[in-house]
Structure formats: C-alpha cells, structure tokens
C-alpha cells in the first residue's frame, strides 16, 4: 500500500522557481500539475471499472482484517471458556470490521451495477444508432461510418416522433381500459 502511495505522489523538486520537472511533463507549474492530477482522480472516481479496481485491494485488506479479528475473538472466547485468564484484554470489535467489509462489498456491487448499465446503454446506442457523428475535436479524421450532422438530427427527430407515438398509444389504451373498468364494476 505504501508503494502505491509513493507512486501516486508527484516527485518533489528543488525549492525556488515556479516550475518543476514532474511526472506530467517538464516545465509545468506545480499548481497545474496538481490540478491535472485532481482531474484525473475525478475521472477515475466516475469510471465504475476504475473504481472497482481501486476497491478490490481494500476489500482484500478488509477481509484479512476481518479474519484476523475473528481469530483473535475465537481464541479469547476459547480461553474464557477454558477458564484461563487472557492477558490481551483488548480485542477489536468483530461487528465493526464486518460492517466495514460489507460497506466495501456494497460499493463494489454499485460499481458493477453502474458498469452493467453503462454497457447496456452502449449496446442499445450502437443497436439503435449504429452510425456516429464526426466529433468536433478531430475534424481532420475521416470516419468511414459517420453521418453528417443534418442526417443525424433527422434520425433523432424520427426517434423522438416514434417515442411520442408509442406514448400516445399507451395513453389511449389506458384511457380505454379505465373507461371499461367502471362499466364492468357497475354491472356487478
């Protein structure tokens, strides 16, 4: 764990001068490096796969701690049952370490659910809109299967129109069902 902490911290430069040669490039001011590192950290927090990868070592550590505390408690309870005095009167609480373990498991479950939802949306997007619009960040790059923006807009408008038609059909159907429901109840 200490090795991970050492790798994530930018190297310290000499004092003086407003710039430092760091891990992000030579001549970049320290404040800018910290800001870029902060942005990278925020991006990793939003990515469920990266978050999952970060939580796995914590889960392993928590499980090891949980097993260690369980073993200590078992030894202490065995000594008490055998009538032996225990010199280690201070044993950590099992319930707190179990709660920590379950909290990490819950976070992992949320990350997996979010990753699954992102993947499902990506598949649905590729299925219903398989062609891409050229990105503004790379106007020089030629994308073979891309649509011009005007065609993309017309496709989106047709999808919205279809969704509205489905919505209206469902509303009409529900009104018909509601209209028939009082008649069948009145006949009873």
Curated annotation (Swiss-Prot):
Keyword Protein transport set for record: no
Presence of the UniProt keyword RNA-binding in the record: no
Assigned keywords, A-Z: Activator, Nucleus, Transcription, Transcription regulation
Record InterPro entries: Mediator_Med29_met
GO cellular component, one term: mediator complex
Compartments reported by the entry: Nucleus
Region spans: Disordered: 1-27
Bias (Polar residues): 1-11
UniProt cross-references to Pfam families, sorted A to Z: Med29
Protein family per UniProt: Belongs to the Mediator complex subunit 29 family.
PANTHER family xref list: MEDIATOR OF RNA POLYMERASE II TRANSCRIPTION SUBUNIT 29
Function: Component of the Mediator complex, a coactivator involved in the regulated transcription of nearly all RNA polymerase II-dependent genes. Mediator functions as a bridge to convey information from gene-specific regulatory proteins to the basal RNA polymerase II transcription machinery. Mediator is recruited to promoters by direct interactions with regulatory proteins and serves as a scaffold for the assembly of a functional preinitiation complex with RNA polymerase II and the general transcription factors.
Quaternary structure and interacting proteins, as annotated: Component of the Mediator complex.
Protein name: Mediator of RNA polymerase II transcription subunit 29
Lineage: Eukaryota, Metazoa, Chordata, Craniata, Vertebrata
Encoding gene (name): med29
């Amino acid at each position: 764990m200490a090795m991970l902490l050492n790798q994530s911290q930018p190297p310290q430069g000499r004092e003086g001068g407003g710039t430092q040669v760091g891990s992000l490039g030579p001549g970049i001011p320290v404040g800018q490096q910290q800001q870029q590192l902060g942005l990278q950290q925020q991006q990793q927090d939003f990515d469920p796969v990266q978050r999952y990868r970060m939580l796995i070592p914590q889960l392993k550590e928590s499980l090891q701690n949980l097993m260690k505390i369980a073993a200590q408690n078992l030894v202490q309870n065995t000594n008490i049952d055998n009538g032996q005095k225990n010199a280690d009167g201070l044993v950590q609480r099992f319930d707190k370490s179990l709660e920590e373990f379950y909290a990490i498991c819950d976070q992992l479950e949320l990350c997996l659910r979010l990753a699954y939802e992102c993947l499902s949306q990506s598949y649905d997007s590729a299925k219903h809109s398989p062609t891409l619009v050229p990105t503004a960040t790379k106007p020089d790059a030629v994308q073979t299967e891309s649509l011009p923006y005007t065609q993309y807009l017309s496709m989106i408008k047709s999808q919205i129109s279809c969704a509205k038609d489905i919505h209206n059909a469902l509303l009409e159907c529900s009104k018909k069902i509601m209209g028939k429901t009082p008649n069948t109840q009145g006949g009873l």
